[in-house]
């Protein structure tokens, strides 16, 4: 039996089928638990729960949620096309006319209008624009000339700039195919572009520094945002582009940087952050994966940034009547 956990979702090639989700009330966003599937995070910061899984029936092996949380991209072992899952109520799943041989990483631009998918079998990066309504394959990046294992991807909203993080280097690639090594970064622990921008935040775990890179595919100008930040696991920016956030998997610390002034404040989490996945709000992020335990979130929209947990999901059970 395959080691991949398959989630049952209903799907028929060429059609999209709605499914009843029963979602009501405020939604902070969505998450994907391999054991249960795609689930809404219900409520508000500090008072949230994980809702019932969306019921969509087909076998899928990978799901990645868009940063705007309105849709997801998925890979199905029984289908060669990229799948689009719409997370509205009712939810639905449909194929995109974009074939993919074997998926690795899937990364979204800040607004979720573009995505980059690592096609491992063909050793390429597929750049998809026009998401979610008019998805088209905008570019393919051949990875055969690069050494090292690809570990992270970031791209901007116009699909004109892509950052690729390998095990031993980081490179910037323009829409024209121009390749520019980011020589001051040895290994990216996390990287993201600003919204509607060619500027990016990159955390270098080899030097424990966090950089702001202006115009990454042109005459790049770099400035140090943090000079000593160990084991950065993820970076993110607020939707208004005013603040950057960096999370450490070693200390559980999340640094908040005002990009205009460079001032830094910190929040702590009794967890080991592995992501900064944006949720609804200007600066609300998920810090950890579910994996059957509590999920930790960061509320950067409160007067002072704070972390809080969402209790683990407990499936509803129906008691058998006593005979």
Residue ranges and their predicted role:
Residues 19-20, 59-69, 100-112, 145-155, ...:
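Repeated scaffold domains used in trafficking and secretory/extracellular systems
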Residues 37-40, 79-85, 122-128, 168-173, ...:
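Structural motif
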Residues 19-47:
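An edge-strand/N-cap motif at the start of beta-rich repeat modules
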Residues 31-34, 66-67, 74-78, 109-110, ...:
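Conserved beta-strand positions in repeat-built beta-propeller and related beta-rich domains
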């Amino acid at each position: 039996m395959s080691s991949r956990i398959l989630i049952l979702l209903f799907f028929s090639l060429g059609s999209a089928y709605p499914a009843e989700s029963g979602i009501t009330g405020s939604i902070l966003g969505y998450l994907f638990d391999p054991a249960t599937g795609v689930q809404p995070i219900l409520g508000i910061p500090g008072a949230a729960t994980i809702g019932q899984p969306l019921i969509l029936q087909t076998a899928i092996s990978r799901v990645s949620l868009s940063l705007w949380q309105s849709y997801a991209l998925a890979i199905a072992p029984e289908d060669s096309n990229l799948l689009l899952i719409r997370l509205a109520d009712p939810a639905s799943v449909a194929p995109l006319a974009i074939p993919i041989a074997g998926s690795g990483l899937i990364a979204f631009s800040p607004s979720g209008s573009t995505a980059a998918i690592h096609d491992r079998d063909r050793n390429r990066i597929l750049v998809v624009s026009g998401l979610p309504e008019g998805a088209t394959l905008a570019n393919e990046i051949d990875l055969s000339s690069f050494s090292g294992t690809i570990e992270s991807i970031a791209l901007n909203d116009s699909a004109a700039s892509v950052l690729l993080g390998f095990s031993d280097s980081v490179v910037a690639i323009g829409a024209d195919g121009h390749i520019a090594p980011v020589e001051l970064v040895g290994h990216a622990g996390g990287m993201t572009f600003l919204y509607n921008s060619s500027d990016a935040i990159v955390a270098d775990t080899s030097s424990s520094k966090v950089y702001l890179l202006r115009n990454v595919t042109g005459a790049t100008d770099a400035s140090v945002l943090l000079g000593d930040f160990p084991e950065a696991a993820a970076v993110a920016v607020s939707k208004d582009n005013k603040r950057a956030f960096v999370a450490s998997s070693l200390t559980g610390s999340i640094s908040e940087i005002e990009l205009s002034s460079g001032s830094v404040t910190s929040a702590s989490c009794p967890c080991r952050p592995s992501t900064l996945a944006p949720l609804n709000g200007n600066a609300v992020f998920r810090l950890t994966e579910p994996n059957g335990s509590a999920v930790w979130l960061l509320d950067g929209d409160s007067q002072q940034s704070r972390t809080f947990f969402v209790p683990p999901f407990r499936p509803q059970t129906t008691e058998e009547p006593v005979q």
